[in-house]
Amino acid sequence: MGMAHALGLEGAAPELVDLMYRTPLLQPSDLVYLGVDLSRETTDWERGQAAEHRIAVVDQTALCDDPRGAAADARRILASGPFLVHLDVDVLDFLDAPIAENVNGRNSGPTIAILGQALGALLQDPDRWGLSIGQLDPAHASADRTAI
């Protein structure tokens, strides 16, 4: 779980946990996973940590069924005030958007159109301070110049 360091979980690298002005950087209530399929995309340890720390999840089915509604649900879970959106491209269906670092998501995950609807809802929120994107590998789509 990449968030282990920000949450200061046991086993996280101290040099990453102590990197910022407060330790841990995030509390579990500061985090909502939107569009995650816990049964496919996570390890037993990650699922255990998410359950133990009660990290909120608006799952992949909810996102695919109603992208804007799922985004609104995720936003309601967070406290009012500023928030950031982090997009891990690995959640996308790799066949629809071959831009992920991890190529195992073939025919699984939301399409780029579904993701766009959810992101549109979140990015229009006046309390949204920023967007970060991770796991993007344009080389995987080098034959398709329209992929990005």
Give residue ranges: language-model regions.
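Conserved alpha-helical scaffold segments that buttress catalytic/binding sites
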Residues: M1-I148
